[in-house]
């Protein structure tokens, strides 16, 4: 699985640590920024991840900011992106199994690094269930995207 990771300045410290952890578990990981702790704008990182996923440069994305919310809001503005904020392991697997989330959003100021690790590996190991009820709901989301994201 190819993983794309990015953060703004508020998520930079976790990104550096977690990037190495993900690689050590055998995942192919691409870091697309930010590369310093200088203040930057989270919508830019969300756009970078969204475009990478849309253009098949990665299978899943991980975005880290202060709360996880800002990057989630921005990433979800892209057709085909299903970004979810997860601050527990249940949400991390359920969001993939039921909603086929392709971008995990975390808040460095919200959770500890150990929990962040657990959430990331839970997210990466989870698989979409393909249950008819979940696929039906995803089809409805696609219809909403097609109607509203022109």
Task: Place the predicted regions along the sequence by residue.
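Glycine-rich phosphate/diphosphate-binding loop of Rossmann-like nucleotide-binding domains
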Residues: 1-24, 28
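C-terminal binding/interaction regions
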Residues: 4-6, 10-11, 89-150
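Alpha-helical segments flanking ligand/cofactor-binding loops in enzyme cores
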Residues: 20, 47, 51, 73, ...
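Short, structured coil segments at secondary-structure junctions
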Residues: 25, 78-79, 99
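A short beta-strand-loop structural module common to alpha/beta enzyme folds
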Residues: 28-39
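Structural motif
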Residues: 38-47
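Helix-adjacent hinge/juxtasegments
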Residues: 48-85
């Amino acid at each position: 699985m190819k993983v794309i990771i990015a953060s703004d300045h508020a998520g930079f410290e976790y990104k550096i640590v977690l990037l190495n952890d993900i690689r050590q578990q055998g995942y192919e990981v691409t870091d697309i920024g930010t590369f310093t702790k200088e203040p930057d704008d989270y919508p830019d990182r969300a756009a970078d991840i969204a475009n990478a996923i849309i253009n098949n440069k990665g299978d899943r994305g991980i975005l880290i900011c202060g709360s996880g919310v800002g990057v989630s809001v921005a990433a979800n503005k892209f057709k085909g992106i299903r970004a979810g904020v997860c601050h527990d392991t249940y949400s991390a697997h359920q969001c993939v199994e039921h909603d086929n989330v392709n971008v995990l959003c975390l808040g460095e100021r919200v959770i500890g690094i150990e929990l962040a690790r657990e959430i990331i590996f839970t997210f990466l190991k989870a698989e979409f269930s393909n249950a008819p009820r979940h696929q039906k709901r995803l089809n409805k989301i696609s219809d909403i995207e097609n109607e509203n994201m022109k």
